């Protein structure tokens, strides 16, 4: 080996080995301090990619487990509401069994029916208000999808159903006793279209209202007219030159119950034109029926002319004892009356109708006549109560306000209907119970999978402390030895000086 001064190859070799041992020491210390074998992609590129995929799966499965727990909570909340609905149905069934006993009086049946109605209303309330995190669980048919896996399509569905008195088939449940209406039971009541003759203001009334003017003779009169929802009194007969300006039209009020016409405290003069003279007042001014209502009237046997001229009236009934009973609204077509609904706020009129199949096979919708429509079974609605006229064949069915018991159409086989409702609730509760068990199973499986994936990831990226401690010790020794050897290597060029002595 040549003796040189400029290049100390032994020193360079030693420095290189010292750098390697220092790098190894740094790596060992990094792994020991972080606990990870792979701290960056340079440590193990393939291992880092695999471990990262495991991390994504582990995080996704952990969240899926939380989702499944939320699914259990939803199902549990819904099942709890169904349990309360079931309790109400059990009570309704108990009441239905009680009502079937012939020892009950009509007042007993009315009380039983009142509680049944309240129980059904509570079922509707529970159905409409039960929710989980803003989602109403029984108000409508719905399918909730719960993500229970780390990948697309790994879901469990919760099928929710609308549960209320209507979907249970109990919205018209009635256990009140039904009576047959025989010919001798029919009460021939009278109808009133709600009109009253107007009581026009007298000369004395007019004088008092308009300041006691001078009038010659008995000439002071007032004729009443109507336009756009207002009544007017056309005053005439002022003969004194100073008072003739008081002749003209004034807004007045009309008492619909008595027909009395009166001026206001401060009479208001009007220039209205086109008003129509009236001699009677009605609770509701006549309102013309719309096209659909006219068609229903015609299908009920009303002539086209009478249907076009049909107007709305307020009904009242006088029973056999002379008692006057306020009824609902009706459409007057010709000399007959037909049950109707009237919205006082909007003025909308709708005839109460019955759909039936005519002899020619066509389906028609006829207005319900207060007395029968086209020979079909009809009903009369008075003050919200329905009266069945089917048993009064061959007779003019009028109002029977005294026989409300006869009006109620008793539900046939009520216990069978309630049992069907209970079965419907039980079926949904069973589904919810089963899906809760599914979620529990999914959570257990997710936990096992997360554990196994975590172990697999650990074997790839976690530090083996036994190995890394050994590596650190080796690197430390090499560092110390390398430093010592480097000092010796740096002394080698000194040997060349001996040749110069």
Swiss-Prot record:
Pfam families: Flagellin_C, Flagellin_D3, Flagellin_N, FLIC_barrel. It is found in: Secreted; Bacterial flagellum. The keyword Secreted applies. GO terms for molecular function: structural molecule activity. One of its GO terms (cellular component) is extracellular region. Flagellin is the subunit protein which polymerizes to form the filaments of bacterial flagella. PANTHER family: FLAGELLIN. Individual Salmonella serotypes usually alternate between the production of 2 antigenic forms of flagella, termed phase 1 and phase 2, each specified by separate structural genes. Belongs to the bacterial flagellin family. This is Phase 2 flagellin. It comes from Salmonella abortus-equi.
């Amino acid at each position: 080996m040549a003796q040189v001064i400029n290049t100390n190859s032994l020193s360079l070799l030693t420095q290189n080995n010292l750098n390697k041992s220092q790098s190894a020491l740094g790596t060992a210390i990094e792994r020991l301090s972080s606990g990870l074998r792979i701290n960056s992609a340079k440590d193990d590129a393939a291992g880092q990619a695999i471990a990262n995929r495991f991390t994504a799966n582990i995080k996704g499965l952990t969240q899926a487990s939380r989702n499944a727990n939320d699914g259990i909570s939803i199902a549990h909340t819904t099942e709890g509401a169904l349990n309360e609905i079931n309790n109400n149905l059990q009570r309704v069934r108990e009441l239905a069994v009680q009502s079937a006993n012939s020892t009950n009086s009509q007042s007993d049946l009315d009380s039983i029916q009142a509680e049944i109605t309240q129980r059904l209303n509570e079922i509707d309330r529970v159905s409409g208000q039960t929710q989980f995190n803003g989602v109403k669980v029984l108000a409508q048919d719905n399918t909730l999808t719960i993500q229970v896996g780390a990948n697309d399509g790994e879901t469990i569905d919760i099928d929710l159903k609308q549960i209320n008195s209507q979907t249970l088939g109990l919205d018209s449940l009635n256990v009140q006793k039904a009576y047959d209406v025989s010919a001798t039971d029919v009460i021939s009541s009278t109808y009133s279209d709600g009109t009253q003759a107007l009581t026009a203001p007298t000369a004395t009334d007019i004088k008092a209202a308009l300041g006691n003017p001078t009038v010659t003779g008995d000439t002071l009169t007032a004729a009443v007219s109507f336009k756009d929802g207002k009544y007017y009194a056309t005053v005439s007969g002022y003969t004194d030159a100073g008072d003739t300006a008081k002749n003209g039209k004034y807004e007045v009020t009309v008492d619909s119950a008595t027909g009395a016409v009166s001026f206001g405290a401060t009479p208001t003069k009007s220039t209205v034109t086109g008003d129509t003279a009236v001699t009677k007042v009605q609770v509701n001014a006549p309102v013309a029926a719309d096209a659909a209502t006219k068609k229903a009237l015609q299908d009920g046997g009303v002539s086209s002319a009478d249907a076009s001229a049909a107007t709305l009236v307020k009904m009242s009934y006088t029973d056999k004892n002379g008692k006057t009973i306020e009824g609902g609204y009706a459409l007057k077509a010709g000399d007959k009356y037909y049950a109707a609904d009237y919205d006082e706020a909007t003025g909308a009129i709708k005839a109460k109708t019955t759909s039936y199949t005519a002899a020619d096979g066509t389906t028609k919708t006829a207005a319900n006549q207060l007395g029968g429509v086209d020979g079909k079974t009809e009903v009369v609605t008075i003050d919200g109560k329905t009266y069945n006229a089917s048993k009064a064949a061959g007779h003019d069915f009028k109002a029977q306000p005294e026989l409300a018991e006869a009006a109620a159409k008793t539900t046939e086989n009520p216990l069978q209907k309630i049992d069907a409702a209970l079965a419907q609730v039980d079926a949904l509760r069973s589904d919810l119970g089963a899906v809760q068990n599914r979620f529990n199973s999914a959570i257990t499986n997710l936990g096992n999978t997360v554990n196994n994936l975590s172990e697999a990831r650990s074997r790839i990226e976690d530090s083996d402390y036994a190995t890394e401690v050994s590596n650190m010790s080796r690197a430390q020794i090499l560092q110390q030895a390398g430093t010592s050897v480097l000092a010796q290597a740096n002394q080698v060029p000194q040997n060349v000086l001996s040749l110069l002595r």
